[in-house]
C-alpha cells in the first residue's frame, strides 16, 4: 500500500515536470509533439489514480464484514490479468503491438460489461448483498478506464511516431 502511494506521488511529480518541459518547446512541430507528450503524461497519471482507487476499494472490501462471492473474486482476478496484459503490451508498443493494445482494450470493455451484468444478476438473486457491490462496480470501472488510458497512450504514441502501425479503434 505504501509503495503504491509512493509511486502515485512520483507519477504526479513526473507529470508536472513533463508538462513544464513540453510548454517550453519552441518550434511548431515540437509544439505539436509536446502536446502529445502532455496527453501521455496525463494518461500515465490517470493510470496511477485508477491503480490507487482499486487498491483503496479492495481495502474497504477487505475491512468490511462482507466478502465478495467466489464469482466476483474470479471476475476481479480476470480484470487484473487483462489490465496487466495491456500494461505489458503498452511497455512494448512498437509496430503491430499497437493493434494488440487496441484488441486488449476491447477485451477489457467486453469483460467489464459482462461482469457488470453478472453482478446485477447476483444482486437480484440475492447471491450477494449491496454492501460491497458498489465497491465491486467501481473497481470494474477503474479497470475499464485503465484500459481506455492505455489505448489513449498507444494512439498518442502513434501520432508522435506515425510510422508505427496501428489500427484505429472500431466502434
Where are these regions (language model features)?
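Cytosolic, long alpha-helical scaffolding segments
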Residues: 1-171
Amino acid at each position: 500500500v505504501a509503495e503504491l502511494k509512493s509511486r502515485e506521488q512520483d507519477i504526479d511529480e513526473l507529470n508536472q515536470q513533463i508538462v513544464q518541459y513540453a510548454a517550453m518547446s519552441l518550434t511548431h512541430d515540437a509544439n505539436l509533439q509536446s502536446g502529445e507528450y502532455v496527453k501521455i503524461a496525463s494518461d500515465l497519471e490517470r493510470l496511477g489514480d485508477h491503480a490507487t482507487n482499486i487498491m483503496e476499494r479492495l481495502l474497504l472490501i477487505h475491512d468490511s464484514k462482507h466478502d465478495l462471492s467466489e464469482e466476483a473474486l474470479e471476475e476481479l482476478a480476470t480484470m487484473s490479468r487483462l489490465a496487466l496484459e495491456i500494461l505489458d503490451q503498452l511497455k512494448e508498443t512498437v509496430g503491430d503491438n499497437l493493434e494488440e493494445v487496441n484488441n486488449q482494450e476491447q477485451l477489457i470493455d467486453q469483460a467489464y460489461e459482462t461482469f457488470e451484468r453478472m453482478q446485477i444478476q447476483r444482486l437480484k438473486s440475492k447471491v450477494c448483498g449491496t454492501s460491497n457491490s458498489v465497491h465491486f462496480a467501481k473497481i470494474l470501472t477503474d479497470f475499464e478506464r485503465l484500459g481506455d488510458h492505455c489505448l489513449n497512450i498507444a494512439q498518442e504514441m502513434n501520432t508522435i511516431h506515425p510510422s508505427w502501425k496501428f489500427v484505429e479503434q472500431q466502434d
